């Protein structure tokens, strides 16, 4: 049996990555992950404790999710803690940040500029689209960005 802190950490990560429309689906996912003694009432308490809410997504489906406010950066947050994920395709790098941090991180990346392979950035609230100066060197540019936040 895995410990309750490990369960709660896994539970929150699961809610961030997966889409669940019912508590039964969450129970099934936790049991499949190796957690014992999981039932609907326990999941209900965990949802309440974590502050999770059931809300509609863009497809009008009701899903459980953690509120964005839980990730609001504070004045003492190191910049590297504000960057949650960095990924790319063949033409663009996408950087996911804590809510409210994207413009700060984008401004930092803009200051680095073309010398490090960054042509420009567009930032929303929690997502940055970064265009490299050379799409053939996009992996190299992504590595430079990752090294800034490790």
UniProtKB/Swiss-Prot annotation:
InterPro entries: Arg_repress, Arg_repress_C, Arg_repress_C_sf, Arg_repress_DNA-bd, WH-like_DNA-bd_sf, WH_DNA-bd_sf. GO terms for biological process: L-arginine biosynthetic process; protein complex oligomerization; regulation of arginine biosynthetic process. Its main location: cytoplasm. Pathway: Amino-acid biosynthesis; L-arginine biosynthesis [regulation]. GO terms for molecular function: arginine binding; DNA binding; DNA-binding transcription factor activity. It is found in: Cytoplasm. HAMAP family: Arg_repressor. Regulates arginine biosynthesis genes. Belongs to the ArgR family. This is Arginine repressor. It comes from Psychromonas ingrahamii (strain DSM 17664 / CCUG 51855 / 37). The gene is argR.
């Amino acid at each position: 049996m895995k410990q309750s802190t490990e369960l709660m950490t896994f539970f929150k990560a699961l809610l961030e990555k997966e889409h669940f429309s019912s508590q039964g689906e969450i129970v099934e996912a936790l049991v499949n992950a190796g957690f014992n003694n999981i039932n609907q009432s326990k999941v209900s308490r965990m949802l309440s404790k974590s502050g999770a809410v059931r809300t509609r997504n863009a497809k009008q489906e009701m899903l459980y999710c953690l509120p964005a406010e839980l990730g609001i950066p504070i004045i003492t947050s190191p910049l590297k803690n504000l960057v949650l994920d960095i990924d790319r395709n063949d033409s663009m790098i996408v950087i996911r940040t804590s809510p409210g941090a994207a413009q700060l991180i984008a401004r930092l990346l803009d200051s680095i500029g073309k010398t490090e392979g960054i042509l420009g950035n567009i930032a929303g609230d929690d997502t940055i689209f970064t265009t490299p100066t050379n799409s053939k060197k996009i992996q190299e540019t992504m590595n430079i960005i990752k090294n800034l936040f490790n």
